[in-house]
Structure formats: structure tokens, C-alpha cells
Amino acid sequence: MAKTITISEEAYKLLLKEKRDGESFSDVIVRLIKGNRREVMDYAGIWSDMNDEESNKLFKDLEKMWERWNVNA
């Protein structure tokens, strides 16, 4: 069942740029939404080439950011 929606001119132009030959706007929207969904397991092993020093620095930096975030919350 088709539904009618209203989008801004800017949204229309952006969708038009993403649209491929033979693709409907519905197809574009579905492709873009599904393409942006990632599962946690998609990231498994992504940092496997990181050494211990780099890993420790990353987590220390993250802790600092989390502390700042908690203070501002």
C-alpha cells in the first residue's frame, strides 16, 4: 500500500542525487535506511591490529571524554 509524504526541497534534491537508474524514491529511502544500520558484531575485530599502547591510550582518552560528558550532564 503506497503512502504519500511531504518532504522539503532540500530533502528531495538529496534523494534525487542518491537515486539510481530504475530505482524508485521508495527504493532509495529503504536502501539508505537499511545501509546505515550496523550490528554490534560488524565491529568485532576491527581494532585487532592495534597494539597494547594504542589500545590503552584509546581507552584513557575515552574515559576522559566520558568524565567530561558526565560533568556536563
UniProtKB/Swiss-Prot annotation:
Q: Does the keyword Lipid biosynthesis apply?
A: no
Protein origin, superkingdom: Archaea
Q: Which InterPro entries match?
A: Put_antitoxin (IPR003847)
Provide the alphabetized UniProt keywords: Toxin-antitoxin system
Please verify whether the record's keywords include Membrane. Answer: no
- Taken from the UniProt record, the cysteine pairs bridged by disulfide bonds within this chain are none
Pfam families the record matches: VAPB_antitox (PF02697)
The protein's job, in short, is:
Possibly the antitoxin component of a type II toxin-antitoxin (TA) system.
Q: Which family does it belong to?
A: Belongs to the UPF0330 family.
Protein name stated in the entry: Putative antitoxin M1627_0365
Organism of this sequence: Saccharolobus islandicus (strain M.16.27) (Sulfolobus islandicus)
